UniProtKB/Swiss-Prot annotation:
Homodimer which binds Holliday junction (HJ) DNA. The HJ becomes 2-fold symmetrical on binding to RuvC with unstacked arms; it has a different conformation from HJ DNA in complex with RuvA. In the full resolvosome a probable DNA-RuvA(4)-RuvB(12)-RuvC(2) complex forms which resolves the HJ. The gene is ruvC. Keywords: Cytoplasm, DNA damage, DNA recombination, DNA repair, DNA-binding, Endonuclease, Hydrolase, Magnesium, Metal-binding, Nuclease. It comes from Nitrobacter winogradskyi (strain ATCC 25391 / DSM 10237 / CIP 104748 / NCIMB 11846 / Nb-255). The keyword Nucleotide-binding does not apply. This is Crossover junction endodeoxyribonuclease RuvC. GO terms for biological process: DNA recombination; DNA repair.
Amino acid sequence: MISSPIRILGIDPGLRRTGWGVLEIDGNRLMFVGCGSVETREHMALASRLLAIHAGLGAVLDQFRPSEAAIEQTFVNKDGVATLKLGQARGVAMLAPALFGIAVAEYAPNQVKKTVVGAGHADKAQIQAMLKILLPKADPKSADAADALAIAITHAHHRKSAALAARMKAVG
């Protein structure tokens, strides 16, 4: 049985910059498709910033037509207001693929780092170095786009167990 390539959208949510990365998996091969970021300005009203994130990701979904999506889980920091705003951006970022009928898998930051680099406490430079090895055609212009590609790679490696867990959760 020949399977067709699967296209995955990785999302690194943020209110200032939401990174996105698209790759395809064909068997064990990872292929870079595209990456970038949706940027908002601090002077914009919160609702306008959230709308810009939604519209930007909607355009990415229209252009690249992924069949699966993954997003990084939010960590809680000492600044409650910043955490809340990040959560709002993350919610909008999850809504965009959901409106296209695409389930969104979630991965902890340490799991992304461990999958891509082999260490759960890797820094951004280590992640970017491994991206050059895993996806040599990728040239992310921002750390957010690089992180989004790392999230997509993580999903490519864990997608079968994530799908099984989602089915088990739905069954109850």
